[in-house]
UniProtKB/Swiss-Prot annotation:
May function as a juvenile hormone (JH)-specific degradation enzyme in vivo decreasing JH activity. Hydrolyzes JH III in vitro. Hydrolyzes effectively also methyl hepthylthioacetothioate (HEPTAT), a synthetic substrate. Of the general esterase substrates, it has preference for 2-naphthyl acetate (2-NA) and shows a weak activity for 1-NA and 4-nitrophenylacetate (4-NPA). Disulfide bonds join 91-109, 268-281. GO terms for cellular component: extracellular region. Belongs to the type-B carboxylesterase/lipase family. It is found in: Secreted. Residues 1-23 form the signal peptide. It comes from Tribolium castaneum. Its main location: secreted. GO terms for molecular function: juvenile-hormone esterase activity. This is Juvenile hormone esterase. Inhibited by 3-octylthio-1,1,1-trifluoro-2-propanone (OTFP), a specific inhibitor of juvenile hormone esterase (JHE), but not by diisopropyl fluorophosphate (DFP), a serine enzyme inhibitor.
């Protein structure tokens, strides 16, 4: 098998002069980037299509030593061929989402993978860049979690990458000593690398679609807003996360306390009062020890998922390219964001992310029910939204979702589902709808919306539960379950086996790659999935939105694709009626 030479263009006389030679051998293709050459391998897609795999390409200098807690810097050129046949280390983390978490990964982790399908033509291919999930404290872009085999059946190039997490990615002293948002700035650096180098791989840097799930989804939306990301992509897909979800909002006021606590945990508290001295001290702490400090912040179960957050930054000589200069809500209200083709959606039961472990772990459930009001107030950031009225908001929530009871009754399916809905709406659905409405009102089009409610053989909910124990309840479609059909994940799940699961996977891949190729998930209108288009968008309401509902399961023959109104209008209306700081007029 040979790849046609026109996959790799020789660009001696263009602005891409660094692509001086692009050569290959039948089994180990070689590509020259701006910084040096990479030897890849030839692999095969689900449908046995050959594709080239280039893994472990550095897109920034290792963020270690003096570069810890600093914005990423471009990689140093290399004068040898990088072995791109295996994944590079993922970013150091402790993944509390899964059972028996331990510190793993490396601080030297800013690497990306590029996957290029075999094609017969000479035209540059559209590019899809995936931003991984993980709550900004876990996750990876490596092929054991984000495998390319399904997408490589289509005529697109796929790029995956790592970015700094937890304390390494999001510590902030709110000044030039550690301005913060380093993980998001890593994402920008990866996009810059793609912009500068993807043509060497046969990709079109004017047809780049960024897409992400959960934390990656919120990141995608923030890239629409950030001035640092301008011009680096042309389309976007957000899966289960948006800029107005609370976990994607900057929380500057909390960070001084977080930094002070971290200093105490690491023996750096003598330097309190001098952010420079604190950061200098923290740079000397061994990476594993620093990662372990996340344990010290936990007050219940794995809460908080992470104490670190996005922050707004000031542009200074020492911080010339801040990622966020104001709260995303203010940017959206001002219409200060990229109005490019955007596909956005969620899964039916987002709340399983935390409901599964809280309910399926008996001791955890007992603790939660014994201290329900206090713990739920903390977990769902009620004081952030309602201030002194948090207790009133809590009562309204329990009345609406839990039948007026301040506990989860595992013997009552309505109670279990009610808690799933409560967590999912608070953490995901409401912020997504807020974001879409506000962006529509500011003239953003085209936008496509979807809701994913297909129940397959496997579920991330079983991973998040972190136990084999269960309750008598039929669990629905969990947060992250859509990923099962876009990416092979051999580090987490066996191969898809059920006919319907495989069919769903091929359909989802078609939607996503159609969007990347044509700017439309349903370009031939086979399913009448139209973008949201309003003559007077300034008055649009949630009830006006037409959403693609994807439903079915692996046990029956029917998979359905229906464009309908939202199925959770009553739940969105509930939150819109509450006195929340993040609410804005005439929403609902």
């Amino acid at each position: 098998m040979k790849f046609p030479k026109n996959l790799f263009l020789v660009l001696f006389y263009t602005s891409w002069k660094f692509c001086d030679v692009c050569a290959y051998t039948p089994s180990h293709p070689l590509v020259y980037t701006k910084y040096g050459s990479v030897i890849g391998s030839v692999e095969y897609s689900r449908n046995s299509r050959a594709y080239m795999s280039f893994k472990g390409i550095p897109f920034a200098k290792p963020p270690v030593g003096d570069l810890r807690f600093k914005a990423p810097e471009p990689p140093e050129p290399w004068n040898f061929s990088i072995n791109g046949t295996k994944d590079a280390p993922f970013c150091i983390q402790k993944n509390y989402f899964f059972s028996n978490p331990k510190v793993e990964g490396s601080e030297d982790c800013l690497y990306l993978n590029v996957y290029v399908p075999k094609t017969e033509g000479s035209q540059l291919l559209p590019v899809m860049v995936f931003i991984h999930w993980g709550g900004f404290f876990a996750g990876r872009g490596s092929s054991d979690y984000i495998g390319p085999e399904y997408i490589m059946d289509k005529d697109v190039i796929l790029v995956t990458f790592n970015y700094r997490l937890g304390v390494f990615g999001f510590l902030s002293t709110l000044d030039d000593n550690a301005p913060g948002n380093f993980g998001l700035k890593d994402q920008v650096m990866a996009l810059k690398f793609v912009h500068e180098n993807i043509e060497c791989f046969g990709g079109d840097n004017n047809r780049v679609t960024i897409f992400g799930q959960s934390a990656g989804s919120g990141s995608v939306n923030l890239h629409l807003i950030s001035p640092a990301s301008r011009g680096l992509f042309q389309q976007a897909i957000s899966q289960s996360g948006a800029a107005l979800d609370l976990w994607a909002r900057p929380l500057n006021a909390l960070q001084p306390n977080v930094t002070a606590a971290l200093a105490a945990f690491t023996g750096c508290s003598a330097h309190i009062g001098s952010s420079k001295d604190i950061v200098d001290c923290l740079r000397k702490i061994e990476a594993t020890k620093l990662a372990e400090t996340a344990d010290n912040f936990k007050y219940f179960s794995i809460e908080p998922l992470t104490p670190y957050s996005m922050v707004t930054e000031k542009q200074t000589d020492a911080n010339p390219n801040p990622f966020l200069v104001q709260d995303p809500l203010e940017s959206l209200k001002a219409g200060a964001f990229m109005k490019i083709p955007w596909m956005v959606g969620s899964v039916q039961d987002e709340g399983i992310l935390r409901a599964a472990p809280l309910i399926r772990q008996p001791e955890t459930l007992q603790t939660l029910n014994s201290n329900f009001e206090k713990l739920i107030t903390q977990m769902l950031f009620l004081q952030f939204s309602a201030g002194a009225n948090a207790s009133s908001l809590l009562k309204n929530m329990t009345d609406f979702y839990l039948g007026g009871k301040s506990l989860i009754d595992v013997n009552n399916p309505k109670s279990v589902q009610g808690f799933i809905n409560l967590y999912g709406d608070r953490a995901f659905h409401y912020g997504i709808y807020q974001t879409v409405i506000l962006q529509l009102r500011k003239g953003h089009k085209p936008i496509w919306m979807y809701n994913f409610n297909y129940k397959g053989q496997y579920s991330y909910g079983d991973k998040f539960a972190a136990t084999d124990k269960n309750v008598n309840f039929t669990w629905g479609v969990s947060h992250c379950d859509d990923l099962l059909y876009l990416f092979k994940s051999p580090g987490l799940f066996a191969n898809l086996q059920k006919d319907n699961d495989i069919l769903m996977s091929k359909t989802m891949v078609s939607f996503w790659t159609n969007f990347a190729i044509y700017g439309n998930p349903d370009p031939h209108q086979n399913l009448n999935w139209n973008s949201l288009n309003f003559e007077k968008p300034e008055g649009v309401k949630v009830a006006d939105l037409n959403i693609m509902h994807i439903t079915g399961n692996h046990e029956t023959g029917k998979i359905a694709f229906d464009v309908e109104k939202s199925q959770i209008l009553d739940r969105i209306a509930f939150w819109a009626k509450q006195s929340l700081l993040e609410n804005f007029p005439d929403f609902g």
